[in-house]
């Protein structure tokens, strides 16, 4: 289903409330990776464009406690849970609530104890276009106290998709990031980006940040408070820039090193797209020092994202 007014149009799918295409008319270029064949999204292992939940990213040991009650979740990455479990929101068929030329809203009702999470959760995902700005608004209500962390998992490439993302310039408005252990889960230690390869406070070419010990990124950056934007991406080849803003405290910057997909019609290689997953912190349900991802029945989960696309002149 296509939607859009002005310089940008988008296509999305009801499976996983997935963002399938973001087409920039001025340059006649699609800016995100997709699987090409819609039927392939029944097994979207790389989560291309998907809405991930109930809890995107990782929760250690696939469990958390609420009010003294221990909830055991479905494991799908060793002993841990990633992106909501074996059958997360990315694999669900979402219903269309309303739509127009400029927007569409999907919703999905997750039953109590689905993948082990407490409470019936009613979630919605609204995609809208105005001029060259793509907005994503994620909402959720629960019947029981639970934890929620919904993200959009689009892989961006401003260089006509076929090439890797190494030559993109990236700026991330973060003075700190979370240290990961060998399972890619935060240890709880907050580290300054100063003097490290994780310093993207100024626009930096991705490949210039690599070292003999570091050839990829998959970390949660802690967004500076009162920031006007979270990240900016720029391509000197296509002369396109992307500015990302959100109300979330973190962003997972992932350079697509685990990408792998091949059929007769489509091949996607590692490093061909990068993700900027605005989010609550990974494993926050088990770390009281992290911003809370807890949602009570009296509350509404609200996650807003804007992608502003411009031609560099």
What residue spans do the PLM features occupy?
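A conserved active-site cap/scaffold subdomain adjacent to cofactor or substrate pockets
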Residues: 158, 162-211
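Beta-strand elements of well-folded, non-transmembrane domains
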Residues: 16, 110-112, 129-131, 140-144, ...
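Active-site pocket scaffolds in enzymes
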Residues: 195-313
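Extended, loop-rich substrate-binding clefts of extracytoplasmic carbohydrate-active enzymes
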Residues: 70, 74-131, 280
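Single conserved hydrophobic/aromatic residue that forms the stacking wall/gate
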Residues: 1-9
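Exposed beta-sheet edge/beta-hairpin loop segments within beta-rich domains
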Residues: 63-65, 114-120, 128-129, 287-301
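Acidic (Asp/Glu-rich), glycine- and aromatic
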Residues: 25, 137-165
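Active-site loop/turn microenvironments that scaffold catalytic and metal-binding pockets
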Residues: 34-89, 185-186, 190-192, 198-199
């Amino acid at each position: 289903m296509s939607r859009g007014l002005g310089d940008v149009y988008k296509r999305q799918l009801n499976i996983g409330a997935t963002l399938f295409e973001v087409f920039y008319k001025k340059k006649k270029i699609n800016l995100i990776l997709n699987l090409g064949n819609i039927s392939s999204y029944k097994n979207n292992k790389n989560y291309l464009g998907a809405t991930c939940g109930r809890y995107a990213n990782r929760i250690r040991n696939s469990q958390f406690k609420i009010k003294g009650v221990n909830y055991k979740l479905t494991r799908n990455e060793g002993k841990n849970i990633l992106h909501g479990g074996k059958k997360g929101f990315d694999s669900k068929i979402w219903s269309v609530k309303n739509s127009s030329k400029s927007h569409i809203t999907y919703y999905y009702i997750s039953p109590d104890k689905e993948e082990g999470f407490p409470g019936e959760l009613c979630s919605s995902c609204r995609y809208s276009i105005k001029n060259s700005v793509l907005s994503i608004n994620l909402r959720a209500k629960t019947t029981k106290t639970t934890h929620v962390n919904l993200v959009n998992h689009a892989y961006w490439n401003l260089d006509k998709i076929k090439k890797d993302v190494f030559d993109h310039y990236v700026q991330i408005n973060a003075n700190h990031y979370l240290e990961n252990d060998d399972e890619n889960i935060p240890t709880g230690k907050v580290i300054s980006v100063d003097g490290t390869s994780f310093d993207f406070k100024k626009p930096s070419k991705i490949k210039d940040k690599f070292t003999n010990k570091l050839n990829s990124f998959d970390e949660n950056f802690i967004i500076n408070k009162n920031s006007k934007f979270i990240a900016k991406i720029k391509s000197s080849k296509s002369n396109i820039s992307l500015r990302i803003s959100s109300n979330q405290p973190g962003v997972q910057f992932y350079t697509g090193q685990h990408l792998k997909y091949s059929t007769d019609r489509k091949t996607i290689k590692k490093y061909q797209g990068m993700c900027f997953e605005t989010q609550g912190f990974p494993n926050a349900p088990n770390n009281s020092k992290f911003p809370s991802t807890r949602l009570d029945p009296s509350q509404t989960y609200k996650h807003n994202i804007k992608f502003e696309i411009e031609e560099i002149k």
